[in-house]
């Protein structure tokens, strides 16, 4: 039995921002969807990667976007107030001085496509890109309420590095990271076909 071949597109900034703005409409669990202009503003002037997995419908009538990831470099000194706050929160747990940090800002899989390996394929492609571009660690933030995402990150060998509790435990913030290197890439399991748009 051969493993699935995941179709992934890697986008440049403007087109990728539009595509992500479109696919986020499928995610009712996310109250604060990002607009294309927000995405472009955040990523402009920094290293970034925009990935989207696509899959054919059961009747092969069309190919649809099913999962996405948007990541960017996270610098020790950030001028954007939200990113500066993130760095401040993570200074004690991440080594910003001796390695490049990649922040997995946005990412999800459509509910009806979960459990089929698309997010794993995107993560593995992200890790290849990160290692190739000199990153030593990937960090991601989620909320306690997103059990599926936390479980997925656990299966992808991300480690919890910080927990910020909230009055409502579901709103507690969970920070996870994964150190990168050749052994991480050797453990990849997905067969991916990547198209750079």
Model-inferred region functions:
Residues 1-66, 70, 196:
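Short amphipathic alpha-helix that is part of the acyltransferase structural core
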Residues 47-52, 68, 101, 106, ...:
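Short hydrophobic/aromatic beta-strand element in the GNAT-like acyltransferase core
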Residues 59-106, 167:
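Conserved acyl-donor/pantetheine-binding loop and adjacent beta-alpha core of acyl/acetyltransferases
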Residues 101-102, 130-143:
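Conserved GNAT acetyl-CoA-binding A-motif
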Residues 109, 115-128:
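Conserved acetyl-CoA-binding loop-helix of GNAT-fold acetyltransferases
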Residues 109, 140-150, 167-169:
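Conserved beta-strand-loop-alpha-helix junction that forms the acyl-donor binding cleft
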Residues 120, 132, 144-163:
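Conserved active-site alpha-helix within GNAT-family acetyltransferase domains
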Residues 165-197:
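C-terminal "cap" of GNAT-fold acetyltransferases
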